[in-house]
Structure formats: C-alpha cells, structure tokens
C-alpha cells in the first residue's frame, strides 16, 4: 500500500514537472515586420535604427553583426532582458508590451 502511494506521488510530480517545463519553453513565433512597427511606436523616439549615433539612447545599427552598443554579445535573451528591464535610464517595457510584441521587436532589433 505504501509503495503504491509513493509511486503515485512520484508519477504525479513527474507529470506536473513535464507540463510546467514545456509551458515555460514555448515562445511566440516572432514576426519581424510587426517588430518594426512595435519599434517605431515604442523605441524610435530614443534609438536610431540606422546609425550608431546616440539619440536619447544608443543607436542600434550593427546589432545583426552580433554586438550590442555596450560591446556585449547580442543574444535574444540579452535583448529581451533589456526590453523588459532596460538600464536604469531606460523605460521598462515588461508590462507595456505583450509577450508577442516583445518577441517581435527583439527579432526586428536583431536585424539592425
């Protein structure tokens, strides 16, 4: 009886973990064209897309070559973290954009 109970708990825990793990890894498929619109509406006031010159924030030209204006490696997760949390002087877009909009703008920024 005790072994059945332990087996049931282990199986239920494994099933819950599997469902949670798959739910956490699913990202919306990015739409670069929509990301350009999101950028125009939310980012273009502070960032040039076609220059490395500073506006309010740094210009973003050249990110497609793999480097952020800070000199750090340009990765999806790093750019998403900047969108969500930004440096201290940048507005956070964590609660201003949907997950889809964030994925779209990250995909677009990675083409600059």
What are these regions, as identified by a protein language model?
Residues 27, 71, 94-97:
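Pocket-edge positions in alpha/beta enzyme catalytic cores
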Residues 35, 39-49, 105, 109:
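The canonical Cys-X-X-Cys-His
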């Amino acid at each position: 009886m005790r072994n059945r109970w332990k087996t049931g708990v282990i199986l239920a825990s494994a099933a819950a973990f599997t469902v949670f793990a798959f739910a956490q890894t699913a990202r919306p498929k990015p739409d670069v064209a929509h990301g350009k619109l999101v950028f125009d509406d939310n980012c273009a006031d502070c960032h040039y897309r076609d220059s490395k010159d500073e506006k309010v924030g740094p210009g973003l030209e050249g990110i497609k070559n793999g480097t952020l204006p800070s000199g750090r490696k340009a990765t999806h997760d790093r750019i998403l973290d900047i969108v969500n949390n930004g440096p201290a002087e940048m507005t956070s877009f964590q609660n201003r954009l949907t997950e889809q909009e964030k994925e779209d703008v990250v995909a677009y920024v990675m083409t600059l």
